[in-house]
Amino acid sequence: QNFIQGIPINRKITIDGNVPFEEFNAYQFNYDGDWRMDTLTGKDGEPYKVYLEKGTHTIRMEVVLGEFSKIIDRVEDVIQELNAIYRKVIRITGVAPDGYRDYELASTLPGTGKELAELSRKLTSIIDTLKGMAGVSGESERVLITMRDQLDELSGDPERFSKVLDSYKSNISALGTWVGNVSVQPL
């Protein structure tokens, strides 16, 4: 649960089965593991006022991803591209490359350095978006930062793939786990 500490989580809020305000389709709360009371307010800080007739009413909150779904989609796209590069590399190196052999990846896979640099830029953009949502850097970005840093290293020297192929694949797997973890928002 601490994995998404600081990242807003979204809830669809219904009263008696109806969404009283458009904003309640994906109302954001800042995740915190502790119990607390929040006043539901608009962007202007004014509390929402809901007229209720005398009697019993049901208020429900349903987990929804809201704006976070766009980030997840972007990370999934990056994972797909990273896997495509991995498959191209192992066609040449095999899954257990000799770290001392020169596979001449720069010439056999031209443009790979540029692809890796572009994926690094995409991850940087995602990291910046997450920081903007959370207001601070946190645990949620660590996996993304690790992958981005490795991409920066490899984009400058694709020949290093033979030395870091296992960690590259592990970092891709970690991104997949990240997607799974952030998709499951706690209640």
Segment roles from a protein language model:
Residues 1-186:
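Extracytoplasmic
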